């Protein structure tokens, strides 16, 4: 075999994925520090991956999710300690721009929450709030976002119709398009399919899998089946503690902690 053949047969090494979110020694308190809901959370979430947070109700999943873009700041009497970094930037630094942070880290909520305006105006709402007025730019981003959200073909002829006239599944995909329009690096999703029927759920799951190539996605879910279907990594929380965090296949086939095994096998009480 000559040198040219050797060079041809060498496969290029894949670049290791960067850490998108680093959470270190993170604690969270409600009620002016009297009630602790998260205890010493440590984890690293890789870029362009899907990570699901699982665990019983009240275990801290959503609290941690909303801490990643500081939505919990809107609640009176909360306190935090530790660090959360987004692509190595401390989100609690004194000079952080909260508006920019929430642009880079988009949020999709449990219940679809389109604004009572047109489909088009929903998608470009955030852009207009940033001062973007050029209609050509707004039109382009609207179309791109709806295409990415797998909704364009269904709404391209009714963009000026009320968003509230869409089905529940369409409304949730519209909310995803609205988040995408802001060109985030990360998408946070808080049980985005819990209010949807099985067919609409499947469409959103297919969309999320497709979005992974461009975004880092962190999703809270109560559906263990959903976690196994779509996520690369799974974190199991219990009573405010991160019990186990690993590749999803390992969590569901060979968990290291007995409490994780009990939960995924339905023995949690």
UniProtKB/Swiss-Prot annotation:
This is Phosphate import ATP-binding protein PstB. CDD domains: ABC_PstB_phosphate_transporter. GO terms for biological process: phosphate ion transmembrane transport. Part of the ABC transporter complex PstSACB involved in phosphate import. Responsible for energy coupling to the transport system. Its main location: membrane. Belongs to the ABC transporter superfamily. Phosphate importer (TC 3.A.1.7) family. Keywords: ATP-binding, Cell membrane, Membrane, Nucleotide-binding, Phosphate transport, Translocase, Transport. It catalyses: phosphate(out) + ATP + H2O = ADP + 2 phosphate(in) + H(+). Residues 21-264 form the ABC transporter domain. One of its GO terms (cellular component) is plasma membrane. Its EC number is 7.3.2.1. The complex is composed of two ATP-binding proteins (PstB), two transmembrane proteins (PstC and PstA) and a solute-binding protein (PstS). SUPFAM superfamilies: P-loop containing nucleoside triphosphate hydrolases (SSF52540). It is a peripheral membrane protein. ATP binds at residues 55-62. It is found in: Cell membrane. It comes from the Bacteria. One of its GO terms (molecular function) is ATP binding.
């Amino acid at each position: 075999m000559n040198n040219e053949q050797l060079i041809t047969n060498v496969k290029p090494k894949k670049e290791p994925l960067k850490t998108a979110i680093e959470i270190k020694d993170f604690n969270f308190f409600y009620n002016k520090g009297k009630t602790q809901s998260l205890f010493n959370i440590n984890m690293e979430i890789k870029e362009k991956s899907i990570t699901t947070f699982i665990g019983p109700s009240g275990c801290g999943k959503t609290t941690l999710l909303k801490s990643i873009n500081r939505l919990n700041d809107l609640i009176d009497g909360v306190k935090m300690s530790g660090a959360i970094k987004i692509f190595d930037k401390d989100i609690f630094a004194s000079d952080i721009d909260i508006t920019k942070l929430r642009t880079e880290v988009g949020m999709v909520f449990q219940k679809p929450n389109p604004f009572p305006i047109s489909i088009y105006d929903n998608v470009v709402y955030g852009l207009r709030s940033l001062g973007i007025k050029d209609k050509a730019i707004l039109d382009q981003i609207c179309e791109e976002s709806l295409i990415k959200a797998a909704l364009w073909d269904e709404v391209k002829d009714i963009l000026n119709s009320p968003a509230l006239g869409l089905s529940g599944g369409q409304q949730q995909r519209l909310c995803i398009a609205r988040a995408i329009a802001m060109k985030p690096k990360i998408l946070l999703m808080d049980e985005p399919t819990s209010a949807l029927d099985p067919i609409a759920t499947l469409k959103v799951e297919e969309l999320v899998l497709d979005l992974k190539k461009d975004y880092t996605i962190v999703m809270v879910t109560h559906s263990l089946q959903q976690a196994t279907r779509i996520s690369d990594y799974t974190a199991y929380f219990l009573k405010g503690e991160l019990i186990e965090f690993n590749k999803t296949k390992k969590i569901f086939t060979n968990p290291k902690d007995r409490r994780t095994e009990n939960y995924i096998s339905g023995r949690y009480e």
